[in-house]
Structure formats: C-alpha cells, structure tokens
Amino acid sequence: MSNSLSTAVQEVRPTQALAPKAKSMDPTIACDLYRHAGRVDFLTLLRYLLHNPSFRFTYFFRKASQQKTHSPLQFFYKILHRRYLYKFGFQIPLSTKIGKGLYIAHFGNVVVHEDAVLGDNCNLTHGITIGRTNRGGRKGCPTIGNRVWVGTGAVIVGKITVGDNVLIAPNSYVNFDVPANSIVLGNPAKIIPKENATLGYIESVMDSACSC
C-alpha cells in the first residue's frame, strides 16, 4: 500500500492510552465504536448505545451474530436485533458477513442481502440496497472489499466483486465488477480510477495496536 493510500484510510489513529481499553472490549465492536466515536472506552460505548441508533443496531447485530449456542443470552440479543431492525429501518440479517469497523452514517432504509459479504471499515448511508440478482450470468450477491464507501441511494446487485478503497457515489447503480482504488458514479455507472478514492470519507480506522 502506498504512503498516500495508507494516510487516506488511517487518518485518525488511536493513542497508546486507548489501546488497553480497546483490548478489554470485543475487537470487532471496538472497531465499530472507533469508527463512530474516534475513541474506545466503556463510557463512550454506553453513550453511543443510548444516543446513536446506527451504532446501537450494529452493536446488537454483532452480539446476536456472534452467539453460536442456543442460550438465553443469544435469544435476548436476537430479540433486540429484531426490534431495532424494524424500529430503525434496517434490513441486515444476522447471517450477513460484515467485517469489523462498520459505520452506518444515517439510520433508515438500509438493505443488505443475507448472502452479501462486506469487508472491513465500510461506510453505509441511508437508502442503499446491496442485493441479489436472481437470473443471468451474475446471479447471486455482491462481495465488497475493505474501505468501501456507499453513497445515499446507491444500488449494488449481482454476483460481483467490489475492490478495496472504492467510493460508490450517491444514486449509482452497480451490477459489474469494480477494481480497487476507484470511484463509481452514475446510472449507468462509470468507473474513475483514483488511488485515494475514499480520502475524507473512510476515517477513524483502528490499527493493529488496538487488536483490531
């Protein structure tokens, strides 16, 4: 990775003082929290659970999907996931594979198919669909790489691959493979190669110092 790209995707790095607190928290949830708050500690976790609907949904999505046993705790997390799914307008099933560092900018009308795969440090905004195509050569669901920003109203469908460090502009329709380090915009969409495509859009990314 070039120096400019490394700077783009790790603009805000945690201090050494935050690292011990991050290590005492589930690493995936710590990365999600850092994407929202720029810090990781339990007071910040509580504050964002109480006041940030997007993070609250993400938290219980993680907890419910991480529980593999049929326990009362798993049932509790699934109930809360289902409650916030309907309350905030998300359609992201527990079987959906989403990497650490998820950031949902605004709650409402966010649809991600259960067979879609999202990488680390992705941004989702309201009014987006990441869905399935039911026929043709691209029958299936998208696989999306790391550090991908999906703009308002964008639609990503079919068995396609979106590379790392890609910005998908608002209202774009994407049903084809997208190479890494690109901007995609329009309907029909076109690809603009750009090394620092997500600079200023993918921020507050935790590094290995925080076990994320």
Regions of interest found by a model, annotated:
Residues 1-88, 199-212:
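Terminal amphipathic alpha-helical/low-complexity segments used for targeting or macromolecular assembly
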Residues 88, 94, 99-100, 105-114, ...:
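Left-handed beta-helix
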Residues 182-184, 188-202:
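Conserved beta-strand-loop-alpha-helix hinge in the C-terminal portion
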